[in-house]
């Protein structure tokens, strides 16, 4: 329809004149593809009425904003979809619209993508998602998310890219580029400091400028400056007592000022709270379900959004000029020319085999082998006769639920079905025992899994059955962890505990005692407590990996694919091993009595740990976590050796290149990720013991070796100087630390910056 409208406008403009020159002369500048985009925007703005300007900067339905029919600008459609295109919902309700062609491929959640440590996977991800979005008529995907993993309790960590700003920065850029190469806008979220789900509308974050710039902003900055994202979504929370959907510091000063961002700022849904701030503090497009109650009961609630009729009225009353409005309109029109008005937009594809293949490849590269005692994995398909699968997460669909990322998929292969299919090829019997009962529901906004997971047996009977079957199995594979229920890996709330729910610890210990070939596969987007780690032979982090979940997990467990994922966050033993909980500042302190139930109440959360997030904190406190940041095993072995640099001294405007040799010393093909961290030997400010500043994944056949080089500039040596409000690289001695995990950096090379 959008292409049809544009074609009609172009055709009408070209009908009357017979001469090509006359046609060109009569074609409006805003439709003339030979003219610079900014000139076309100027012309369009000059033709638009006040009402037409207003209509394109606020929602007209749950996920769309209006175009300008008179000028041929079509409506603009957004959709949730960090890891799949969300099913269509009703115009003014969250229930699904009942479409028959809005199923999709569910790609792995972004924690899994980050765990691949492979920017190429990000590019593949973005391109495939863009094609799915195009087929569905979507112009903007509301993602990716790059909020930092500050606490493992955050219910939305599964949507993000881990704890390290450098890793997130590298991984987010190709995702954006891949998505936007298809003419679909990214909308990087949630800018910024949205690191909790609990009280997300009310939390005011108090953070040092240094931590803000070194930890919480770099991935957004990379998305803007390197990824060239066309959209940024503001966050629900407050910073300096202003909501981040209209914040003078984060939006006007940093994003649009310091970073020269030329795209649109979209409110999170219902994230606008004030007319004057919405007008003056950087918000460009307002979306949502409500606006502090103003829209309830109206004939057309969307007309009561702050950037709708209230804005028009304020302009007419002289409270605002059209200066701010024209900047918003300019940005939205620029977005239109990049998407809906882009004549070179390709065609979309839905649920294609190439998309399923991409989902599976990303999943296989992101699955992390955490522990493999006595080489219990891969399953020996030549000797095994019977494999027991245990756990609700072996059968439960994980694509439905979890909040706005919930999907309606064409197919989702369960871990149990994936293993049955794969092991059946070798004549291996696969048995199943439930083991525990967790969340038996399967409905989100009208999308249902169709599963009946009811099981009324007692905990004791469920465990007894699993243990009895485990005693005679060659292997026992348990799929446990979290799910997409409230207070687990789900939007809107945080987890209440670090421990596994549903008494899974008890089941795990019993199974480990019953069978020495016991493997625990953790399905989650978060770390969990593992008090039984020493008793378990194998541990795999399986994430939420979407449509091809069963296929990918079966490939890893049987050795058809060699695991190469690395953790994108530090897996702590307990909450007290994270700065947020060690300082006891999470979730914050309420300003008034009554907590969340008191209208207008704000909860202040101070990030007292500052820059010491994740491995930076465990290094500082000399804590040995359950599993380190960057940790991940393989079925083969690698030797990283011969670290050297192309110089011993580096100029402020220069670079230095570090090279190592990586050799596959094992018996099967595999991939290793070389990680480079920088240690500042002596600084004028307190600095982390080390910081990730480079990595590269390399694929090697048995016996094969390659040299891997990583080049850094002074940016990798810099810290944010609060006194001058700028980045600073101090002359002096540094060390490059190289290895394959934050706790396994055996190579060291000294150099100097002068």
Predicted features along the sequence, with ranges:
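Bacterial Sec-dependent N-terminal signal peptides
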Residues: 1-26
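Short beta-strand elements
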Residues: 744-754
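Glycoside hydrolase catalytic-domain context in secreted enzymes
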Residues: 17-719, 726-742
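Acidic/proline-rich low-complexity IDRs
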Residues: 2-5, 9, 506, 642, ...
């Amino acid at each position: 329809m959008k292409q049809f409208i544009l074609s009609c406008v172009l055709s009408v403009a070209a009908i009357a004149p017979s001469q090509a020159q006359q046609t060109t002369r009569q074609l409006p500048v805003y439709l003339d593809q030979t003219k610079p985009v900014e000139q076309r925007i100027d012309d369009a703005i000059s033709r638009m009425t006040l009402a037409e300007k207003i209509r394109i900067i606020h929602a007209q339905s749950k996920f769309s904003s209006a175009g300008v029919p008179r000028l041929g600008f079509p409506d603009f459609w957004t959709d949730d979809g960090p890891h799949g295109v969300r099913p269509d919902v009703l115009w003014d309700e969250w229930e699904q619209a009942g479409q028959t062609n809005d199923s999709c491929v569910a790609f792995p959640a972004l924690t899994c993508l980050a765990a691949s440590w492979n920017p190429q996977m990000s590019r593949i991800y973005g391109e495939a998602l863009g094609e799915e979005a195009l087929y569905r008529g979507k112009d903007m995907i509301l993602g990716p998310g790059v909020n930092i993993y500050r606490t493992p309790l955050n219910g939305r960590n599964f949507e993000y890219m881990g704890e390290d700003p450098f890793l997130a920065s590298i991984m987010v850029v190709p995702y954006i580029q891949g998505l936007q190469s298809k003419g679909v806008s990214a909308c990087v979220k949630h800018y910024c400091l949205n690191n909790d789900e609990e009280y997300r509308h009310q939390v005011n974050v108090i953070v040092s400028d240094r931590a803000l710039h070194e930890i919480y902003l770099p991935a957004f900055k990379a998305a803007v400056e390197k990824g060239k994202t066309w959209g940024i979504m503001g966050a629900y929370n407050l910073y300096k007592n202003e909501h981040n959907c209209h914040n003078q510091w984060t939006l006007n000063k940093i994003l649009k000022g310091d970073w020269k961002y030329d795209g649109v700022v979209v409110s999170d849904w219902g994230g606008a709270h004030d007319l004057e701030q919405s007008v003056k503090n950087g918000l460009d497009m307002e979306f949502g379900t409500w606006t502090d109650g103003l829209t309830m009961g109206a004939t057309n609630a969307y007309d009561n959004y702050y950037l709708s009729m209230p804005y028009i009225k304020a302009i007419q009353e002289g409270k605002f000029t059209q200066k701010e409005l024209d900047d918003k309109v300019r940005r939205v029109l620029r977005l239109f020319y990049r998407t809906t008005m882009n004549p070179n937009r390709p065609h979309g594809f839905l649920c294609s085999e190439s998309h399923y293949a991409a989902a599976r490849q990303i999943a296989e590269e992101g699955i992390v082998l955490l522990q493999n005692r006595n080489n219990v994995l891969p399953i020996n398909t030549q000797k095994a006769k019977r494999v027991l699968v245990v756990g609700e997460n072996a059968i439960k669909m994980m694509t439905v639920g979890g909040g706005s990322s919930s999907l309606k998929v064409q197919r989702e292969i369960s871990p149990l079905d994936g293993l049955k299919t794969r092991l059946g090829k070798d004549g291996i019997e696969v048995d199943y025992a439930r083991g525990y009962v967790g969340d038996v529901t399967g409905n989100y906004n009208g999308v249902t899994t169709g599963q009946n997971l009811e099981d009324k047996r007692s905990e004791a009977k469920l465990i007894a059955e699993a243990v009895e079957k485990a005693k005679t199995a060659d292997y026992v594979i348990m799929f446990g962890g979290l799910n997409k229920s409230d207070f687990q890996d789900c939007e809107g709330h945080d987890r209440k505990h670090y421990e596994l729910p549903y008494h899974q610890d008890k089941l795990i210990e019993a199974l480990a005692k019953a069978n020495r070939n016991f493997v625990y596969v953790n399905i989650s987007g978060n770390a969990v407590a593992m008090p039984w780690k020493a008793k378990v032979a194998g541990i795999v982090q399986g994430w939420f990996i979407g449509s091809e979940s069963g296929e990918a997990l079966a490939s890893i467990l049987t050795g058809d694919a060699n695991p190469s994922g690395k953790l994108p966050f530090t897996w702590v033993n307990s909450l007290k091993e994270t700065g947020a909980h060690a300082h006891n500042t999470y979730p914050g302190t309420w300003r008034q009595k009554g907590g969340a139930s008191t209208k207008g109440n704000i909860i202040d959360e101070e990030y007292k740990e500052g820059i010491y997030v994740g491995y930076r904190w465990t290094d500082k406190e000399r804590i040995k976590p359950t599993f380190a940041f960057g940790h991940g095993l393989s079925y083969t072995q690698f030797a990283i050796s011969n670290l050297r640099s192309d110089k011993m001294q580096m100029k402020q405007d220069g670079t230095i290149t570090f090279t190592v040799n990586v050799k596959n010393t094992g018996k099967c093909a595999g991939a290793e990720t070389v990680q480079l961290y920088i240690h500042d030997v002596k600084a004028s400010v307190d600095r982390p013991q080390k910081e990730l500043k480079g990595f590269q994944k390399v694929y090697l056949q048995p016996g094969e070796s390659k040299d891997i080089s990583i080049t850094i500039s002074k940016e990798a040596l810099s810290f944010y100087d609060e006194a001058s409000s700028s980045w600073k690289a101090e002359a002096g001695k540094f060390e490059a630390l190289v290895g394959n995990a934050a706790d396994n950096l055996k190579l060291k090379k000294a150099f100097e910056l002068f």
